[in-house]
């Protein structure tokens, strides 16, 4: 059990038979009446976001999540197949379960899979990934006086804005949280 006073961004709670992650929270102490905590919760299963208000000090069940490191081995139709490198068990996840992170997922990549009651609910990618640029416009010297950017498609199909000097075949480092270019990789 966790008190609503202890809510922080990223806290996971169990409510109405689902796992919810606290996206935003605000402790409110009105001049008249008792204090309360206003929250925005995101469902780990469906991705829905709801606003919910808790009384200050209200006890809520905390969700017990298990985190395991799995390797993405291959695609089978629309499913992503992952393997536990210790037990060699395979786990299949749909694109919806993986979410937006699937655009950076490539075979052989290790990710953390978060499970609740033995059901995978979320995939955590590394903070940065190194991918090869497969498609981009050629950058011509003297195009701009200051640093400009152009769109580039990487090997997984994701589109990232990169500096003008990046060309096809180069490996670049991308921040998976902000979808931004971090630098070249050799």
UniProtKB/Swiss-Prot annotation:
The protein's name: Elongation factor P
Family assignment from sequence similarity: Belongs to the elongation factor P family.
Gene Ontology BP annotations: peptide biosynthetic process
Predominant cellular place of this UniProt entry's protein: cytoplasm
Claim: Nuclease is one of the keywords in the record: no
HAMAP family documented for this protein: EF_P
Keywords carried by this UniProt record: Cytoplasm, Elongation factor, Protein biosynthesis
Function, as annotated: Involved in peptide bond synthesis. Stimulates efficient translation and peptide-bond synthesis on native or reconstituted 70S ribosomes in vitro. Probably functions indirectly by altering the affinity of the ribosome for aminoacyl-tRNA, thus increasing their reactivity as acceptors for peptidyl transferase.
Compartments, record wording: Cytoplasm
Source lineage: Bacteria, Bacillati, Cyanobacteriota, Cyanophyceae, Synechococcales
């Amino acid at each position: 059990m966790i008190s609503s006073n202890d809510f922080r961004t990223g806290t996971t709670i169990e409510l109405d038979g689902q796992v919810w992650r606290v996206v935003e929270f605000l402790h409110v102490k009105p001049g008249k009446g008792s204090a309360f905590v206003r929250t925005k919760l995101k469902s780990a299963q469906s991705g829905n976001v709801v606003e919910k208000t808790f009384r200050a000090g209200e006890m809520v069940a905390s969700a017990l999540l298990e985190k395991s490191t799995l390797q993405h081995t291959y695609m089978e139709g629309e499913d992503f197949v992952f393997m536990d490198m210790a037990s060699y068990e395979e786990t299949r996840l749909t694109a919806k379960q993986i979410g937006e992170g699937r655009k950076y997922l490539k075979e052989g990549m290790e990710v953390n899979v978060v499970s609740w009651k033995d059901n995978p609910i979320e995939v955590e990618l590394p903070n940065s990934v190194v991918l090869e640029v497969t498609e981009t416009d050629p950058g011509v010297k003297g195009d701009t006086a200051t640093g400009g950017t152009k769109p580039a498609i990487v090997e997984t199909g994701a589109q990232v804005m990169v500096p003008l000097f990046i060309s096809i075949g180069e490996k670049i480092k991308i921040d998976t949280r902000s979808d931004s270019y971090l630098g070249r990789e050799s």
